[in-house]
Every structure is written in structure tokens, then in C-alpha cells.
A protein has these predicted regions:
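N-terminal accessory nucleic-acid engagement/regulatory domains that precede
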Residues: 1-89
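Conserved SF1/SF2 helicase motif Ia
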Residues: 117, 138-167, 176-186, 335-340
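Conserved interdomain linker/interface between the two RecA-like ATPase lobes of SF2 helicase motors
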Residues: 204-226, 350-414
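Post-DEXD/H (motif II) to motif III coupling segment of the RecA-like Helicase ATP-binding lobe
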Residues: 316-377
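SF2 helicase catalytic motif II
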Residues: 274-277, 282-288, 292-337
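Conserved pre-motif I regulatory segment
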Residues: 63-121, 130-138
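Conserved helix-turn-beta segment of the N-terminal RecA-like "Helicase ATP-binding" lobe
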Residues: 161-258, 358-368
Length: 414
């Protein structure tokens, strides 16, 4: 059923077995430059040679029980009953264990770093996001009260990544709702500021921001239902009265998200700022010059209402001209804040991560710490494959054609 093995008839009539990966490589190596209404038999070949690299896939071992970590480091993680309860709520998932680097990140980030920096480097799927949000939500949660101000700004280089992490942060925030309520505090609020964030709750505004429609309702472009993963819509009846509320399109689900948990419009971002604000480097650069919106990032506010944390994801992508522009924006924001903030970066492995992050944010190199899994903390699990293709110079086809044809072929094989 998984189509991992194929039966291939040979010229002599025998049946031969070929794995899906081997069949994929055969098709990739035989790739040709195709055009509409032209026979493929005479089309130029695109691949002259290939190499396959297979290596064990290595992940950080997750062996540490959250309860043991709290017991060993109670003075750091659990300085108050609220902090202890938040830790237990965030780590209550059955069977949850933490890796060594996640534990070290939690210990460092659970307290203020006085304008210092922390960069967490690990491979994809290693749990870097948890390494930030676990201690981050403890610090944010203990400062929540009846008033509203942005306590953490999460900055992303790409909108799609912002959407993924927004959903994950929202799910984590909901795990501590009861804990916060038991301590007399409101739920944690999350908001997003990027191109599709409407200014106000009107049908025309949502249309202008290219929100997709489902009948009379509008589909939220940056979040799906946390319960069943269906679309969330802003109902026409709620838009008409200016109520910011999302509802799942699946009738049997019944999930609703109100304005005490999510902020949908720029006007509401100004009126009731969220506890965590998701944005992009481009929007940050634009809004720092906007006197109506710059207060959302802590500019011009008292020191007690300025962000505690600044998260930068995919730090390794900030290179070249794009990286220089991002660094200028971050240093400008840091100067305008004129107040200590804990810089946190998440990244793939970098050669000199601490110096790279210091150059990016302007934080003093002596105050920047890299947290990464040690060699002893890895375990092998599965395998990863890398395929290198060399274009065929004899065909006079560009490497771009090879890239396009291969990109079209691979999704049909995976």
C-alpha cells in the first residue's frame, strides 16, 4: 500500500523488484527538457551524472523528565508557585521528555539576560521551538495581569514559517489557560502583524487583504483549527458587529476562539496589544517609522511595558544583503527601545553562532551564549538522503531547466 517496492517486468519476462527510491533515481537521471506539443523522445537530456549520499539521521536524545528538571533547578525555574504551575502545565503532555539542550535553554531563558543573547542551534525537528517557548511562556505568564502590552516579539523571515509557529504557540498558550485562571489572571493573547492583518473588522477591509471567502464568511489566512485542523472563519455576523472571533467550519468540532485569546486587526493590536506578537523583519522595519504602530514594539513606552523577549527564527538565513538589512533594522529597534531585552535566536548549525548572532542583533559578544546539543547527546534514528545532480552540458539546457523538471518530478514520487 505504501508503494515502497515495485514489480518491474524485464525483457526476458522475469519479474524484478525495484525500490521506490531506486525507481525515483532512474527517473531523475533520465529527466528531459519537456515542452508542450513536442515529443519527449527527442528532448534534450538534463542530467549527466548524479551522486547519492545516505547517512544516519541523528537527533538529540530526549531523556530528561520535566518533573526531575524542576526538582533539580527549582530555584531557577520555580521561583514562585505560579512559575512551578506553569512549568507543570506546559510539560503535562503524556510521555513528554526534554533533551539536554532544551533543559539548558530553559535554565538560561527563564530569567532576564540583561540585553544579552542566546542562540539555540540544532537540526530540523530537534525541538528548538520548545527550547524557546517553554521558558518564554513562563516569563510571559508571570507578568500577565489585567492590562495589555507586548511581552515578546517573534520575528520571522518568511510568512509561511510565521504561520506554522503561530499555530504552535497558540496551542501551547492554551495549555496554561486554567493555570493562569487559578492564579487570577486572564488567558495569554497572541496576535500577528503582517501584510494580511486587516486594519479593522469590515468586509471591505478583509476583501482588500485578500482573505478567502466561504459563503459570507472569511477564512483566517494564518491559522487553522487547533482541534481538528480545518479552516477557521470569521463569520459575517461577527464582522457586522465588530466582534473578533474565529469559528471552525466543521460543525461537529464547535471550536471558537475569542478576542481574549487572539487579536485579529491592527486597531485591536493598538487598543489591546497581545502578549506575544508575531511579525516579519520587513514589517518591523516599516512600522518603526510609523508613530501610530511603533508603540506596539515598545518604542516610546515606559520601561515596565517594553518587550522582555525578542525571538529570531531561521537565523542562518540572515546572510548577504538581506542579513545586513535585517541587522540594521534590529539595531535600530534596539536603539529606540533604550531598554534591556533578551535576544533569542533559533538556527541550524553555524560555524561561529555566537559571533554571528552578536553581529546580527548588536548584543555584546561576551553576553551571547550558544546552546547546542553535544556529541554525546545524539542518537541515530532512521536515515537521510542527499541527491546531487550534474547538468548535461551537451544538451545546452540551463541548470534552471534541470531544477524545474526535477522539482516537478519529485512530488509525484514521494
Amino acid at each position: 500500500d505504501a508503494k515502497l517496492i515495485f514489480e518491474m517486468a524485464s525483457v526476458g519476462g522475469d519479474v524484478r523488484i525495484r525500490s521506490r527510491f531506486a525507481e525515483m533515481m532512474r527517473l531523475v537521471a533520465a529527466n528531459r527538457q519537456l515542452f508542450p506539443n513536442k515529443p519527449w523522445q527527442g528532448a534534450p537530456s538534463l542530467v549527466a551524472d548524479f551522486r547519492v549520499d545516505r547517512r544516519p539521521r541523528r537527533f538529540p536524545k530526549r531523556e530528561r523528565l520535566p518533573a526531575d528538571i524542576l526538582a533539580e533547578h527549582g530555584s531557577v525555574l520555580g521561583g514562585s508557585q505560579l512559575r512551578q504551575d506553569l512549568w507543570r502545565a506546559l510539560t503535562a503532555r503524556e510521555g513528554m521528555k526534554l533533551a539536554g539542550f532544551q533543559e539548558r535553554a530553559a535554565l538560561r531563558l527563564s530569567a532576564a539576560t540583561d540585553d544579552g543573547g542566546t542562540i539555540v542551534t540544532a537540526g530540523t525537528g530537534s525541538g528548538k521551538t520548545i527550547a524557546f517557548y517553554l521558558p518564554g511562556m513562563i516569563r510571559i505568564g508571570e507578568t500577565i495581569s489585567t492590562d495589555h502590552w507586548v511581552k515578546a516579539v517573534a520575528i520571522y523571515p518568511r510568512i509561511e514559517l510565521l504561520k506554522d509557529q503561530f499555530a504552535e504557540a497558540f496551542r501551547m498558550a492554551r495549555t496554561i489557560d486554567q493555570t493562569l485562571a487559578s492564579h487570577g489572571r486572564r488567558p495569554m493573547m497572541i496576535g500577528a502583524l503582517f501584510g494580511k492583518t486587516p486594519t479593522r473588522a469590515t468586509r471591505q477591509e478583509l476583501t482588500d487583504k485578500t482573505w478567502a471567502q466561504r459563503g459570507e464568511d472569511f477564512v483566517c489566512p494564518w491559522m487553522r483549527c487547533p482541534r481538528c485542523d480545518n479552516e477557521l472563519v470569521w463569520r459575517a455576523v461577527d464582522i457586522a458587529v465588530g466582534t473578533e472571533r474565529l469559528a471552525c467550519v466543521q460543525p461537529n468540532c464547535g471550536q471558537e476562539i475569542g478576542d481574549d485569546q487572539i487579536v485579529l486587526t491592527r486597531t485591536s493590536l493598538q487598543r489591546n496589544p497581545p502578549d506575544i506578537l508575531f511579525t516579519t523583519t520587513e514589517i518591523l522595519n516599516q512600522r518603526l517609522s510609523d508613530h501610530w504602530m511603533r508603540g506596539l514594539f515598545g518604542v516610546g513606552l515606559t520601561s515596565a511595558r517594553k518587550p522582555l523577549l525578542a525571538l529570531l527564527d531561521e537565523v542562518h538565513t540572515y546572510e548577504g544583503g538581506t542579513g545586513a538589512q535585517a541587522a540594521l533594522t534590529l539595531r535600530r529597534w534596539r536603539h529606540l527601545l533604550a531598554s534591556p531585552i533578551s535576544w533569542v535566536g533559533l538556527s541550524a548549525t553555524l560555524g561561529d553562532a555566537a559571533r554571528f548572532f552578536s553581529d546580527l542583533t548588536g548584543a555584546d559578544l561576551d553576553d551571547v551564549v550558544e546552546i547546542t546539543p553535544t556529541l554525546e547527546e545524539f542518537e541515530e534514528q532512521g536515515a537521510e538522503y542527499q541527491i546531487l545532480l550534474r547538468g548535461d552540458p551537451a544538451s545546452r539546457a540551463s541548470l534552471l531547466s534541470t531544477t524545474i523538471q526535477t522539482s516537478m518530478l519529485l512530488p509525484r514520487l514521494l
